[in-house]
Amino acid sequence: MYGLIFTTFMIVIIFIGPLTYSEPFALVNSTLILSNPTFDSINPQFSVLNNSIYAAWISNLSPQNSDVMFKKIDNNAKLFTSILDISNTPGISNIIKLTNSKDNVYITWEDKQPDKWKLLFTKSENNGNKFDNVTNLSNTTGNVHLHDLSSVGENVFIMWAANENVSSTNKDIFFRKTQDGGDSFNDTLNLSNDKDDSLDPHMAINQNGSIVYMTWTECDTKHDDPICSISFTRSLDGGNTFTTSKIVSNKMLSLEGYEGYSLSNGTGVNASSNTIFPHISENVTVQEGINSINPTVFTTLEGKRVYVLWEQSIFGKGESEIFLTVSNDYGYSFNSTINISNTSGTSRLAHGQLLGDDIYVTWSDTLNNNKTFDVMLRKIDAKNLAGNVINLSNNSGNSVSPYLLVSNNKIYVAWIDDTNNSSVLLWIGDTSESPVMTKVMSNGQAEVYSNPLIFDTENKVWIAWTQYDDNNNHKIVLLDQEKL
C-alpha cells in the first residue's frame, strides 16, 4: 500500500554553459511516486544527510482529516522505508517544515485542533526510523499562521506567526529553541510585540547556530488595504536574546559601482532606472504606498553577510518588483537596496541561494507587461554588483514557480511551463565566466504539475514536484539526475 511506484517521465533539459551537443536527445528516467496514490498528497519537504533523503508531505485521508507523512529513501532509490504517519490526528495537519542534523530528524507542522491551530514538533534520533511523542510548541499563543524551522546539531530553532492569545486579533512573531535536540524547549519569546500584523516568518542561521537572523512581513492594520513592510531582527548569542526589530524595506539607495545591465535579448537599461531614490518616496500617500511582502533571508557560513530578499509593489500600480538588501556587518546596518528585476511588468515568486558571498536569484516575470510569465535569473556578487538578467524560459507560455539550486559550480533551475501542456523544465548553467550557450535538449509533457523543488546528494541532483493525476489526486514525484 505504501510502496514506491515507478513511472516513465520525460523532462526538458536546457544546458547553458560550456556544454554542447550535436543532436538533441531525450532524457528518460524512472520517477519515484513517494506518496500513496489512494490519497491526495501535497506540500512536500525534503532534507538530505549524506546519501539519505528524508521526505515529508501532507496526505488528505478524508475531507475532514489530513496527516503528515514521512519516508526515507537512499541515494540509489533502491532502499526506502514504509510511509510513516507522523501526526496521526483526527483533524487537519498542514504546512510542514523538515530538517536534520547528524542522526536527528526534526519535523514541525500546523495542526487544526478543536480550540485552535497549533504548532507541533516531533523528532527522530535514529535517522527517521522512529519518531518521538509530539510536542505542542505554541501552547502559550493563539492560532498559528505559518512558521519556519532551522537546526544545527541538537540546537533547533522555531519561529512562527500567531495571535498573542485565542481572543486577540493582531498577529505577532514568536520564537522557541531547544539545545538538547527537542527534549526540552526554552520559554516563548515575542519578537514583534506591536499593534501591527506580523506574518510570513523566515530565518537563517550561521554554520554553528551562534547567529540567528529573522525576517517577516509587518502590515499596518489601520487601513482596509494594509501597507506592508519587511521587518528584521537578529540574535548574536544563539537565540537567547534578540535586537529590537527594524524595517529593512522601502529604503532605496543607489547601486554603487554599477553602470547598468542588459536583458538576455540585449536590451540595455540605464543604471538610474535600476534604483528608486529616497526623495521619490517622501510624498507617497496611503493609496500609493510601497507594499513589501514574501521575504526570505540568507547568511554566509560565518554569519557576517546577511541578505534579505522580498517582493514589492510600487505606488499602488499593481506591478511588483524583486528587491534585495545586504548587510556586511552581522545585520547591524543595511547599506544597499537593489531592484533585481526592474521591469515594467509583474515580478513574482523569487527564490535565491548563496554561493560563498554571491547570491543567485530566480523569479517569474511578465517583463514589459506581457500576458505570460518568463523565468529570470540574476547574480549579485560580493561587491553588490549585479550581473546580467537571463531569461531562462523565453517562450510563449507561462513559466512559473522557479526553484534554484547551486552546487559544484553548477546552477540548476526548475519550473512549471504550460507552453504546450503542463511540464517540468530544468535549466542547467555554469557559474564560471565561460561563454553562454543555450540548446534545447528535449521536449516533454505529461499531466498537470506544480511546485517543483531541487536538492542534491553526493553525486545526484533530485527534482521533486506535485503531480495531479487522472483520479483527481495529487501525488508527490521524485526524479534523479546524475551531476554533471
Show which residues each predicted segment covers.
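Extracellular, repeat-based ectodomains that mediate carbohydrate processing or recognition
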Residues: Y21-L484
